[in-house]
């Protein structure tokens, strides 16, 4: 019996070592990557060039990186992070994609195109109304978006390139770009898109082509109504149209509308309440000159290009028209400052 106990103890030790050693190695590898990237230049924006020629149907990845709408994808693993259902797949060429389901796929697809057009770094996101996935188990989240034969409905596909390494997250109030017009522009884009989920975890730092790229890597909580945990929404045309864009202006600064703090009576999570209250300041005290700069950039977009952002996201013709008109109104408001 004692011998059995010793054997069992040895097995358990080996089991836990088998779990902890790879985890420690992964942690050590990530730390080395962070240290190696420390001397690389940090960038948050690049000149988009001739904005009027950009293809906003395909966005940052272009047609070259677009997923095969008729292809079959192979299930890899489910991702339980965040609030939206997500899982990873591989296509026939071995390219890895992260599929997101729920309320965010359409809004995020459109949002990344507008951010990219303004010169900001984004993930390569595409929207497909249907995706066939083989080997798909019963999902712990999002099973209601799956029909017989492994057909997944209303999916956002994010291309995962091996060459891109995530080394961390960044904060709105502490980063290398505070005080620059490019950073002011990104702050204003959050109001233009009505992105109310401005948590640090949604901002990533990628190492790409010898530089550290700072980007908003989750823009799914957009094109709805900003507000508390009861009133806010995503991908909600009526809520977006009825939202105020510019809160107030002075000769020197502009405050843009942003509501994020929880309803006071539901604020049992005090740290979350404080975090979301602070988020409302992300879009405040923007230099007027910076607002004009962003307006001039976005003003180069044609009405058709703006519509393409929403067509690419699978919205109906009426929704495409509604969202596009509201975006145009907000761009016009920037240029009228």
Where would I find each of the regions flagged by the language model?
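Regulatory N- and C-terminal appendages and interdomain linkers associated
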Residues: 2-5, 11-76, 91, 298-337
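Conserved ATP-binding subdomain of kinase catalytic cores across diverse folds
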Residues: 61-173
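Extracytoplasmic/secreted envelope proteins and their assembly/folding machinery
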Residues: 86, 108, 112, 186-189, ...
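Sec/Tat-exported extracytoplasmic proteins
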Residues: 91-93, 118-119, 190-196, 331-335
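Solvent-exposed, acidic/flexible segments
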Residues: 101-108, 179-185, 192, 196, ...
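Conserved kinase catalytic-core segment
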Residues: 107, 113, 165-243
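Residue-level detector of family-conserved "landmark" positions at structurally sensitive sites
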Residues: 125-126, 203, 320
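C-terminal catalytic region of ATP-dependent kinase domains
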Residues: 212-337
């Amino acid at each position: 019996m004692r011998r059995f106990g010793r054997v069992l103890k040895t097995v358990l030790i080996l089991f836990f070592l088998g779990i902890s050693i790879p985890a420690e190695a992964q942690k050590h590898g990530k730390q080395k990557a962070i240290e190696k990237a420390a001397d690389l230049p940090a960038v948050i924006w690049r000149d988009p060039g001739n904005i009027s020629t950009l293809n906003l149907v395909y966005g940052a990845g272009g047609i070259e990186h677009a997923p095969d709408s008729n292809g079959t994808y192979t299930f890899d693993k489910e991702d339980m992070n965040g609030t939206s259902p997500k899982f990873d797949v591989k296509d026939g060429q071995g390219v890895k994609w992260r599929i997101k389901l729920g309320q965010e796929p359409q809004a995020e697809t459109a949002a990344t195109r507008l951010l990219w057009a303004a010169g900001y770094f984004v993930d390569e996101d595409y929207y497909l109304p249907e995706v066939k996935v083989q080997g798909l188990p019963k999902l712990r989240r999002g099973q209601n978006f799956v029909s017989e034969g492994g057909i997944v409905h209303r999916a956002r596909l994010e291309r995962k390139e091996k060459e891109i390494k995530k080394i961390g997250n960044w904060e709105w109030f502490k980063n290398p770009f505070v005080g620059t017009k490019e950073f002011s522009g990104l702050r204003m884009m959050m109001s233009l898109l009505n992105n109310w989920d401005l948590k640090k975890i949604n901002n990533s730092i990628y190492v790409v082509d010898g530089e550290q790229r700072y980007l908003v890597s989750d823009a799914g909580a957009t094109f709805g109504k900003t507000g508390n945990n009861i009133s806010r929404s995503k991908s909600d045309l009526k809520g977006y149209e009825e939202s105020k864009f510019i809160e107030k202006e002075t000769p020197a600064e502009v405050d843009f509308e942003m509501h994020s703090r929880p309803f006071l009576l539901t604020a049992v999570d005090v740290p979350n309440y404080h975090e979301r209250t602070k988020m409302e300041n992300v879009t405040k005290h923007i230099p007027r000159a910076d607002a004009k700069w962003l307006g001039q950039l976005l003003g180069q977009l044609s009405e058709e290009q703006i519509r393409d952002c929403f067509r690419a996201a699978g919205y109906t013709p009426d929704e495409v028209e509604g969202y596009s008109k509201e975006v145009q109104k907000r761009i016009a408001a920037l240029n009228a400052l």
